[in-house]
Amino acid sequence: MKERIHDIYRPVGERRHDFAEVEAALDEAAVRDQMLRCHHCGIPFCHGAGCPLFNRIPDFNAAAAEGAWLEAYRILARTSYFPEFTSRICPALCEGSCCSGVNGEAVMIRQCEKKIIETAFASGWVRPFVPPRRNGRRIAVVGSGPSGLFAAEHLNRAGFAVTVFEANRKPGGLLRYGIPDFKLEKRLLDRRLAVMEQEGIVFTADTRIGKDVSARYLLRNFDALLLAIGTPAARDLAIPGRELAGIHFALEFLQGQNRVNGGELAAPPVSAAGKNVLIIGGGDTGSDCAGTAIRQGAASVRQIEIMPRPPEARSPSTPWPAWPWMLRTSSSHLEGCEREWNIASDRFIGDAAGRVAGVEVHEVVWEFSADGKPLKPAPKPGSDRTIPADLVLLAMGFTGVPETGAAAELELKRTPRGALIPEPGRRIYAAGDCANGASLVVRAMADARKVAERMTEELLS
C-alpha cells in the first residue's frame, strides 16, 4: 500500500518567483492510491470529529477509487458548496482525525477532495443550481467572504432571492483580498462566482454598508439581513516605537499585493523589495506574509513567535482524534523564511528618518502541563537582543468587528471578545467570524450553513 506523499510542491526555485499555485497537481493514479488507503478504518472519525462540514469522506473516496468520479462529486457536493476553496486553503482538520494517522500517516484527504472537484469542473458536472421556484422572500447578505458566499448559496437553494453586498471593488472578501494567489488563484474564485450569478445570486460590489448604503435601508427593502463581515480588526502591538514608519498590519500588506495581482493597483502600497522583513506572529497569516515578501524580492524574511516550538509529532496534550498541536512547515517557510519561537517583543527601534530599523526582543521560557500543554511564559534573563528590520508586519490575529459600518449603525451588542450578537427579532443575523471570532475558513462556512438553515426555518415558518 502506498504511503503519504510529502513532496507536493512545485520546485522552490520556480515558485518563489511567481504567484501561481504552489502545489503541483497529483495525477489520478497517485490520488487513487491515497483513496485506497482510506478503506482501512473501522469507524471513520474524519467526517465527524474532523470536518466541520461533515463531508462524507470515506464515501467519496470509495466512489472515486472505483472510477465513479461523478458519484464522488455528487457525494462531496451534498455537504460542501465550494470544495475547490477548502481543498486548497483548509488545514485539513479531517486528516488530524484520520484513523490511518493513529499509528501512521493520515490519508491525503485534501488532495483527494481537490482532484474530485477539479475533475467535476473539467467534465462539465458543476452546473448552476437554480431553485425550481422562489419563495417570495429577499435576503441581503453583507460580506462576500467564505461565510457570506456559503450562506448566499444555501439561501438561494432554499428559494430566497439573495443579494450579496461587498465593500471592495470585486466580490470574494477574504478569499480574494486576504489569501495570496499562490495558495488560491483568483481564477478559481471567479469561476465559482460565475456559477453563483447564473443561479440568480446578485453581487453588488464597491458598496460599503453604513456609508454608501445604510443598513436600515436594507432592513426596509429586504426580509432579513445577514452580516458576514469577518473580523477585520487586527490585534495591535502596543509597545514603544509603534508610531514609526514601516510597521504594518499583515492584512494591509497581503491586500496590497492581491490588488496588484488582480489589476486594481500598479504597485503594492507596502513593498518588501530589498528589505529585511520581520513578521511578528507565527500563524498562517504570518506564513502568507513570508511567501509574499519572498516573491516581492525581500533581502531576508524572519518570522518570530512568542509561543514555544511545537513538537515534531502530535503532542500528548492533543490526543487523537483532536487536531494535533505539532510543528507545521508551510510552503512559504521552505522558500527561505527563518523562524524563531519563544520570542517576545519589547520595543521598536527607529532611525533618524523616523523609520523602523529593528525590534528589541527577549526570549521566554515556558511552563508546561504534565501532558505538554504550554501554560505561561517567563522572561529568560540575559536574553535581550535586537533583530534588524526595516519592514515589520504584525500578524498576531484579529480582535473582532470595528465599531463602524453596519454593526455600528444597527447598534448591535457584542460578546466580551468583540463578536456580534445577532437579533433575529429584528431580522438581523450574523454568521462566520463576525459572530464567533476569528477562525478557519471551513468553520466559517459550517457556521454559515447553520445560520442559513435557521433563517430558512424562521423566515418561512
Model-derived features with residue positions:
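Glycine-rich dinucleotide-binding loop and its adjacent helix/turn
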Residues: 116-132, 191-211, 234-296, 410, ...
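Beta1-alpha1 glycine-rich phosphate/pyrophosphate-binding loop at the start
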Residues: 2-24, 36, 54-66, 71-77, ...
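Extreme N-terminal leader/targeting segments of oxidoreductases
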Residues: 1-34, 84, 104-137, 242-256, ...
